[in-house]
């Protein structure tokens, strides 16, 4: 896949900008220079933000016993400080240093857990707060400030004057450091969360009112940059919306509690994002697996949705975010119909253009592989590739090109997408049975092929007819001797039991409630192969995928269908698969 001159120039500018911010951040984080952010003045806490994230009181006893189980790794401290231990993974270190686990101690809410929380904070101040720079990365720092402010009433209850001064002095120092360096973090959600943390501090701490106007202005600018008109996030990661609202809703409450009018941009962002939470949900309450989504935090999602006063039907068209949704009967279909996000915000984006997910009642049928909750880096490269999605792969290549480089990964905090689909066209027909037709040019530079996908969901939701077709970049038919080989993949949810039909052109899908769905196609090469569903709540799970193989000119279009059959009586045999129909 070739990279255009414009894309090369943009990449060079981004690398230069990120390198500059990295150098500046490193200089400011140097222990010999960090004294600039110290102050002899001790501020006072005026109010604490609400923490909407779910807490588990049973985790408090583990932490008290020195057993720190984060991100799938366990460290037993054996009377040593956890901040002196060698982290078993970066994810474990981020969780420890961000103090998100303080909420579990608060949930237990006893004199012992309060004392334990103060001891651990004291240890961090001794070990990390002065001379060790690992806890001063901007994304970690932002989350720690929010957590310390949110849990301050719990932590400071019964605390002596010495700890109170020490706590506030350290918190003030961290806020000053963040104020100076917030723009040195990478673009996207991390930068927005840094600015949100600054606004939390401005509203919660005495002596910060002079920074209110500037912090609010930065918040407004970043919200307008990152929250799209249809409510999606500019990174195209649906999971970012849950995390964003979990921080924005308490921020709006803080403005009201301080008798200040929340910025209109804040209210607008919340109002736009809230309906998108329903847009991305399947019938079982989980999010569709697009562009970096892992296991859905269903408890947090339910908490956030409780603030939605409208509770209306989700929108069906999100053109700015690049997604489409069809609801019919008890079925829901979501499709990725957008190009990759801007290069500087594409570290988590996937090469899944025109992939779709489908659910029936409380069951997910067709899915993408998603990402696991822990050990993401071990799976990220595989999960982002096109074959991990329910769409078409040509010549076993992804429709996007990732810039795989250790130095780039360290600089950008991930692997950006440097080229991919740019011309993604969508036609939507809502009269009668809802129909979508979309195409993308992600394979034009490598294969000279435009992929078009059309899907039609019956009005009762019991039949999905689809067609994948291939043309040249000018829309002309491909020659019969075209050499590009395609694989049309349909990854199935691990709860689905699948078996091939005797004729080899179909697959029977058995759901938990004994509902039957039949996949059918006229293509000769239909396989049922192993797959993995990475986004399971209990970790990666084995599953299967339906794969149709062929060559783009032979044929130039492949029709397929999923059809529902009522629950089978004991001993009954399923009907023979019907020929796919596509009334387009």
Tell where the protein language model's regions lie, with residue ranges:
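Long, acidic, intrinsically disordered low-complexity segments
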Residues: 34-59, 73-107, 187-203
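Short strand-coil-strand connectors
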Residues: 71, 327-331, 361, 395, ...
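CBM-like, beta-strand-rich accessory domains located in the C-terminal region of large
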Residues: 2, 142, 377-584
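Residues that act as N-cap/strand-start positions at coil-to-secondary-structure junctions
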Residues: 62, 219-220, 274, 318-320, ...
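Carbohydrate-active enzyme catalytic cores, enriched for enzymes
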Residues: 228-371, 427
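Residues that flank catalytic or metal-binding motifs in active/ligand-binding sites
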Residues: 97, 194, 322, 354, ...
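Extreme N-terminal leader/anchor segments
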Residues: 1-78
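Aromatic-lined, polymer-binding surfaces characteristic
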Residues: 90-270
């Amino acid at each position: 896949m070739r990279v255009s001159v414009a894309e090369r120039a943009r990449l060079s500018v981004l690398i230069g900008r990120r390198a500059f911010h990295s150098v500046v951040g490193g200089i400011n984080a140097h222990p010999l220079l960090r004294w600039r952010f110290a102050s002899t003045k001790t501020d006072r806490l005026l109010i604490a933000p609400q923490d909407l994230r779910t807490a588990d009181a049973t985790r408090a006893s583990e932490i008290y016993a020195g057993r720190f189980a984060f991100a799938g790794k366990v460290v037993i401290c054996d009377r040593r400080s956890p901040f002196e231990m060698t982290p078993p993974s970066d994810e474990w270190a981020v969780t420890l240093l961000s103090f998100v686990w303080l909420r579990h101690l608060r949930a237990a809410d006893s004199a012992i857990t309060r004392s334990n929380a103060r001891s651990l904070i004291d240890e961090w101040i001794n070990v990390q707060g002065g001379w060790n720079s690992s806890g001063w990365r901007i994304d970690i720092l932002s989350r720690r400030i929010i957590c310390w402010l949110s849990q301050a009433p719990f932590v400071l209850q019964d605390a002596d004057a010495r700890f109170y001064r020490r706590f506030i002095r350290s918190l003030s120092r961290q806020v000053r450091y963040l104020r100076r360096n917030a723009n040195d973090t990478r673009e996207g959600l991390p930068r927005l969360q840094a600015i949100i943390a600054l606004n939390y501090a401005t509203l919660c701490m005495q002596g910060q009112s002079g920074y209110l106007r500037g912090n609010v202005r930065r918040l407004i600018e970043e919200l307008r940059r990152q929250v799209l008109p249809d409510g999606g996030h500019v990174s195209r990661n649906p999971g970012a919306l849950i995390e964003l609202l979990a921080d924005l809703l308490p921020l709006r409450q803080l403005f009201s509690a301080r008798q200040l009018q929340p910025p209109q941009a804040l209210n607008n962002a919340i109002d736009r994002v809230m309906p998108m939470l329903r847009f991305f949900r399947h019938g079982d309450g989980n999010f569709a697996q697009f562009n970096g989504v892992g296991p859905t935090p269903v408890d947090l999602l339910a908490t956030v949705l409780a603030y939605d006063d409208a509770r209306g039907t989700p929108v069906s068209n999100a053109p700015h975010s690049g997604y489409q949704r069809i609801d019919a009967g008890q079925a829901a279909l979501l499709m990725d119909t957008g190009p990759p996000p801007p290069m500087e915000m594409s570290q988590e984006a996937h090469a899944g253009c025109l992939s779709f997910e489908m659910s029936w009642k409380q069951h997910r049928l067709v899915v993408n592989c998603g990402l696991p909750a822990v050990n993401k880096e071990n799976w990220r490269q595989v999960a982002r590739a096109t074959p991990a999605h329910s769409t078409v792969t040509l010549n076993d290549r992804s429709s996007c090109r990732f810039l795989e480089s250790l130095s780039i990964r360290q600089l950008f905090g991930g692997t950006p997408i440097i080229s991919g689909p740019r011309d993604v066209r969508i036609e939507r027909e809502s009269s009668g049975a809802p129909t979508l037709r979309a195409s993308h040019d992600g394979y034009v530079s490598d294969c000279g092929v435009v992929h078009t996908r059309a899907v039609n969901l019956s009005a009762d939701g019991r039949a999905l007819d689809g067609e994948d077709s291939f043309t040249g970049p000018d829309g002309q038919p491909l020659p019969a001797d075209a050499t590009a080989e395609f694989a049309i993949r349909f990854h199935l949810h691990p709860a689905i039991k699948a078996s091939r039909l005797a004729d080899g052109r179909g697959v029977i899908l058995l759901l938990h409630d004994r509902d039957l769905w039949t996949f059918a196609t006229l293509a000769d090469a239909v396989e049922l192969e192993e797959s993995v569903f990475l986004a399971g709540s209990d970790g990666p799970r084995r599953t299967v995928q339906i794969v149709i193989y062929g060559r783009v000119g032979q044929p130039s279009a492949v029709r397929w269908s999923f059809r529902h059959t009522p629950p089978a009586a004991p001993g009954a045999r399923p009907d023979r698969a019907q020929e796919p129909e596509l009334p387009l």
